[in-house]
Amino acid sequence: MYGIEYTTVLFYLISFVFVSYILKTITKIMDYIIYRITFIIVVLSILSNAQNYGINLPITGSMDTTYANSTQNDNFLSSTLCLYYPTEARTQINDNEWKDTLSQLFLTKGWPTGSVYFNEYSNVLEFSIDPKLYCDYNVVLIKFVSGEELDISELADLILNEWLCNPMDITLYYYQQTGEANKWISMGSSCTVKVCPLNTQTLGIGCQTTNVNTFETVADSEKLAIVDVVDSVNHKLDVTSTTCMIRNCNKLGPRENVAIIQVGGSNILDITADPTTSPQTERMMRVNWKKWWQVFYTVVDYINQIVQVMSKRSRSLDSSSFYYRV
């Protein structure tokens, strides 16, 4: 009886050792195969990235035929597009799936699904303060509103250029502009800006520094104002501080990944006459006003022509169109 039990135990022990040996052998073989396959994949992936101009070219016809480089990337496959529109557009369209519809239409123009972002703003003031120009290409739709031409024109100057801005303390200091690129930018729900130029003795020129009613008004009840005064002359300023803020800004140059489409209006607003706009390349265009669906269809149709006058940025910016320095 005891002999049978010992034999059974010995059998299971030998079986366990044998199975363990087989498993270890299989593991070594699998490791060898996996390492080999991984090595081959790495080598092939490196070789496949080379400029293989002759791969899959037919030899049946004339070799003078021009063939496109098969490794060339599509223009927009790795680009992002931000489309900014007023709240009025969404309200009028009144369709919960309208963005999905437009995304599919942009796909027909070479913009992959997920590369186009739709950003809503309520008014010019909100957009000028915090535009969030994140994308490689940024297209802003602004509906022309009679009486707001100046705000729209100055918004265009603001977002089509990069600015470096400092806070201004007009209660303590006088300020002067040092050149054509130096402007004072005020924004708020209602901005009225008055200035009093000063002579070398800090006396008012045509105004009294102690009486703001004698100051010259350079902006009156505007949401956004880019103030330009005589260079190299000190000025005392008066601003409606409760509804407006003002900054001392220098124009650094064009923001070439931004374009503006004016919706409606008899004439396109032109900011290229400004001597500080350099180079004199206008990234503003106009479409007729009918319905917002018609506007978006037009944008989709011409989006690739629009981005041709723009330059893709290698980095995204969220600087409210300015850089703040304190």
UniProtKB/Swiss-Prot annotation:
Residues 165-167 are annotated as: CNP motif. Ca(2+) 2 binds at residues 177, 228-229, 231, 301. Disulfide bonds join 82-135, 165-249, 191-244, 196-207. Residues 237-239 are annotated as: LVD motif. Coiled coil: none annotated. Residues 253-255 are annotated as: GPR motif. Glycans are attached at residue 69. It is found in: Virion; Host endoplasmic reticulum lumen. The keyword Glycoprotein applies. InterPro entries: VP7, VP7_1, VP7_2. Belongs to the rotavirus VP7 family. Homotrimer; disulfide-linked. 2 Ca(2+) ions bound at each subunit interface in the trimer hold the trimer together. Interacts with the intermediate capsid protein VP6. Interacts with the outer capsid protein VP5*. This is Outer capsid glycoprotein VP7. It comes from Rotavirus A (isolate RVA/Pig/Australia/BEN144/1989/G4P2B[6]) (RV-A).
